[in-house]
Amino acid sequence: MRIHDIDPDNRPRERFLRSGKEALSPAELLALILRSGTPNLNIIDTCNQLIAEHSLEGLADLSLHELQKIPGIGQAKAMQIAAVFELHRRIRFAKNINRKIQGAQDVFEYMQGRIPDESKEHLFVLFLNTKNRILSHESVTVGTLTSSLIHPREIFKAAIRQSAHSIILVHNHPSGDVQPSNADKQVTSILKKSGDLLQIALLDHVIVGNDDWFSFRDHSLL
């Protein structure tokens, strides 16, 4: 059933024009993009069902293959859904370019959507200028963080190449528990000493979870 089969007063397009985009529900906004539902459900009911079963956040995390497993979602609709969330991700990234870091919350917000597979542990380095604005970031390792996987020379070589004044370490804990392990503390200590020698300060080490973070600096561990 298509949008044109819905009563004119209830069509998302007409409601958008009449009341503005803010008046539309998430399902109605999604319906404007997908346009047609399934043989048994109109597009608004289809989108309401999608969001009820998966949530907007859940839909954003699904791969193209996983989206196509949902009844009524073929390749074209799966690509439309994926494209919407990818655009949102890129807009969020664009807003963070050259962002000034004033604390661990800024680091947490900057990293949202930048960790490619949150089921694995990733270590990133943020390179900052003299005003604590982000110059760039690089992925360093994937997998459980240990001192044997960390090569200070490579990290600080990259910092020098970026003309960075300081760096911040960031890594995720897939479990969601942001408390640092002994290995996390050891890695932080090694890189702080290396940074002190090169006069490139390690400003912080931030561990991120699902909706929380741990700052070594805030807990006086740096």
From Swiss-Prot:
Lineage, opening ranks: Bacteria, Pseudomonadati, Chlorobiota, Chlorobiia, Chlorobiales
Intervals of motif JAMM motif: 171-184
Highest rank taxon of the organism: Bacteria
Keywords: Hydrolase, Metal-binding, Metalloprotease, Protease, Zinc
Coiled-coil segments: none
GO molecular function: metal ion binding; metallopeptidase activity
Domain MPN positions: 100-222
Family to which this protein belongs: Belongs to the UPF0758 family.
Residues involved in Zn(2+) binding: 171, 173, 184
Entry keyword Thylakoid: no
Pfam family, one: UPF0758_N
Species of the source: Chlorobaculum parvum (strain DSM 263 / NCIMB 8327) (Chlorobium vibrioforme subsp. thiosulfatophilum)
SUPFAM superfamilies, sorted: JAB1/MPN domain, RuvA domain 2-like
Any one biological process term the GO annotation gives: proteolysis
The protein's name in its UniProt record: UPF0758 protein Cpar_0627
